[in-house]
């Protein structure tokens, strides 16, 4: 996707209703979800919105590949130890209104942590302090985390890669989101590698 396409995606998200927290997921690994999440967050920030992107892929975190992370404190530290989320913030110096929270230490019980009341409180705190909360998750067909977060957050974007994602898997992922009353606001198509 090019920069203009992320502006288009940003505009579509903005006009999808009262949306603050957005889950970005895919059916499988390697479909481009983290890249879409990172670029969508940048696009919102460049559009003068206060944005935080959160790495909720607690088993295989990858936001460090897109941003310079200058703290070891992450989501797991904040949620498990009831810490102030501000201690986990890293800043992208090139984009004024973009904050980053990485996953933190890999927990032994990622799914339980994702589904906890403490996680819900963490997300709601971020919603109260940012215009947009972009959440990068593990793939839906690998773990149930994205589906659980879809039930908590305002909206979900599902990324798929042309030539790789099977239609049946995409349909299955859509159904998983809808089964928890998740608000699927769009499919993001990534062309073949």
What are these regions (language model features)?
Residues 43-47, 151-152:
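Alpha-helix C-terminal capping segments
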Residues 23, 99, 136:
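Conserved beta-strand segments that form the floor/walls of ligand-binding pockets within enzyme
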Residues 25-26, 46, 107-108, 158-159:
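A short, structure-level motif marking secondary-structure boundaries and short turns
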Residues 1-31, 35-38, 45-50, 56, ...:
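Short boundary/hinge segments that flank catalytic cores
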Residues 111-193:
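Conserved catalytic-core segment of NTP-binding enzymes
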Residues 37-40, 111:
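Short amphipathic alpha-helix
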Residues 1-3, 7, 11-18, 26-31, ...:
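P-loop/Walker-type NTP enzyme "switch/lid" segment
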Residues 49-51, 132-133:
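A generic structural motif
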